[in-house]
């Protein structure tokens, strides 16, 4: 899984392809370990924000160098949303943060009143000393529906750590009515202190 996110259909294709081959999960794990040891990729663990514990589910992998990734796949896929998420991950690591992927378990009633359990994802849980930030990477926020989708996991977190959306949209840095900071990717990359504003 050497990308920040894979589309659902791509995941199914990969799973089916691997099942048809004679490659074992242990072999895949070894290759991923080799890639990590050679500093091609880095893994981020999943962290249950409410339960305050790491989850033994698949990790997410990020490339150290997106140029190498793009060259290796012959520049066939350029998914800007995934690339931006990878850039944010790399910048956070460069600034010294430990970075995990957040999971927020929720129980919600559907239209019929039946309770369903879901896991909402927070792209990054960043820790440095006593500072913690929850960060969502949103390539664009074209409408209120997309903004609501990005804010939803934050609203289910019951602590006072800072919650931030980083977007490619050229918006001024601002807080919304829930205290969630929105900052554009350019300000984030150029101003190491922008998360503290």
Regions flagged by a language model, labelled:
Residues 1-37, 43-44:
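Conserved helicase/translocase motor-coupling segment
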């Amino acid at each position: 899984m050497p990308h920040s996110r894979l589309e659902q259909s791509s995941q199914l294709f990969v799973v089916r392809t691997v099942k048809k081959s004679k490659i074992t999960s242990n072999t895949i794990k070894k290759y991923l370990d080799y890639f990590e040891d050679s500093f091609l990729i880095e893994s981020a663990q999943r962290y249950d924000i409410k339960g305050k514990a790491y989850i033994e589910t698949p990790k997410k992998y990020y490339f150290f160098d997106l140029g190498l990734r793009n060259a290796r796949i012959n520049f066939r896929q350029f998914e800007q949303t995934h690339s931006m998420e990878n850039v944010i991950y790399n910048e956070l690591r460069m600034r010294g943060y430990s970075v995990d992927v957040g999971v927020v378990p929720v129980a919600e009633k559907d239209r019929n009143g039946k309770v369903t359990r879901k896991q909402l994802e927070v792209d990054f849980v960043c820790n440095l000393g006593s500072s913690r930030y929850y960060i969502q990477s949103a390539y664009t926020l074209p409408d209120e529906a997309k903004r609501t989708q990005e804010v939803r996991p934050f609203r289910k977190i019951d602590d006072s750590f800072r919650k931030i959306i980083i977007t490619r949209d050229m918006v001024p840095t601002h807080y919304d009515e829930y205290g969630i900071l929105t900052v554009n990717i350019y300000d984030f990359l150029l101003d190491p202190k922008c998360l503290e504003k």
